[in-house]
UniProtKB/Swiss-Prot annotation:
It comes from the Bacteria. Keywords: Cytoplasm, Glycolysis, Lyase, Magnesium, Metal-binding, Secreted. This is Enolase. GO terms for molecular function: magnesium ion binding; phosphopyruvate hydratase activity. Binds a second Mg(2+) ion via substrate during catalysis. GO terms for cellular component: cell surface; extracellular region; phosphopyruvate hydratase complex. The keyword Cell wall biogenesis/degradation does not apply. PROSITE patterns: ENOLASE. Belongs to the enolase family. Catalyzes the reversible conversion of 2-phosphoglycerate (2-PG) into phosphoenolpyruvate (PEP). It is essential for the degradation of carbohydrates via glycolysis. It is found in: Cytoplasm; Secreted; Cell surface. Pathway: Carbohydrate degradation; glycolysis; pyruvate from D-glyceraldehyde 3-phosphate: step 4/5. Mg(2+) binds at D246, E289, D316.
Amino acid sequence: MAKIVDIKGREVLDSRGNPTVEADVLLDNGIIGSACAPSGASTGSREALELRDGDKSRYLGKGVLKAVANINGPIRDLLLGKDPSDQKALDRAMIELDGTENKAKLGANAILAVSLAAAKAAAQDQDLPLYAHIANLNGTPGQYSMPVPMMNIINGGEHADNNVDIQEFMVQPVGAKTFSDGLRMGTEIFHHLKAVLKARGLNTAVGDEGGFAPNLASNEDALGAIAEAVEKAGYKLGTDVTLALDCAASEFYEDGKYNLSGEGKSFDAEGFADYLKGLTERFPIISIEDGLDESDWAGWKILTDKIGEKVQLVGDDLFVTNTKILKEGIEKGIGNSILIKFNQIGSLTETLEAIQMAKAAGYTAVISHRSGETEDSTIADLAVGTAAGQIKTGSLCRSDRVSKYNQLLRIEEQLGAKAVYRGRAEFRG
């Protein structure tokens, strides 16, 4: 049985040019597992703490040398000699060493990087693909599926410097037969969308997640442009391709009002729920993420009651990959899906627990990147290894996004006939 003989942390850059944490876990047989922690822009208030230095003389205060020092010091000392395959023991030990509710002492970025690096080392040690090792850790050995990609092809909100309030407009190739076919469909739509925007005299620069970020008259205008691109690509909207939104509503919620500054409109919770309901009636939108503010549970209940039978309502800032919060949401009938982000909770073990709790309650689980990413493609293996069925990892450009899609293509090839792609069956309604 291999043992951990060294752990190394370092400061690297993410896709926004901000520092993040990378960790190496070295085993006594020479195997090395490496992983990076991602970082978000629109974040939930109850996420685990991303430890940054606050030293304005380095990286505008965003350095992560404190987190790196925690890896190279106390975390390393704690885990030396441990079995890398006992993921739960490693993660629990780090959580106990931290001793805070939100990992504020060691930093969720430090704990997560080591947690994922250990999983990668353990997978290599057992001569397993990472997705297979994750399935074993999840208690579902050999149960895999290829996720439906939710491809963010127009960026707004905190992910772009434009006037569009809703943060993400996504296409889902639900009519594809395989993941690779779905990826091709999304890519073709992406290129046609560029032509549609150019023909309208609009900017085709991209946002943080690789989607186009033009100024548009309204959120409905963005959906209309995508609908035109789908048609020009030769696909049928609502059958071959469906739509999804990430409102990130907490970013435009203030004093009990949802303020769409790009449209000059303001709503109370019921009014905004009706606004979203109207969009789902005019377009084949089958998933809405963070449709209401994370603290507006009454509003979430209104939205769930209005459209929850037909539309996947995903809690991101709402649930922050946290089983305590998710449990409360399930009990109160809030939403019907959870977004899964490693760094919101800070360890692989806790991430798997959130997925398991969601599935047991009949909620869907959507595996997700962050807007600040690296070349690390672990979420691709997580999606397949947990058979989550859905993945959000951005648009069809920027290597920090495409690296995840390319890993999924490799996994699909490895699985061969076992590479199940369920398409529309992964969604509600």
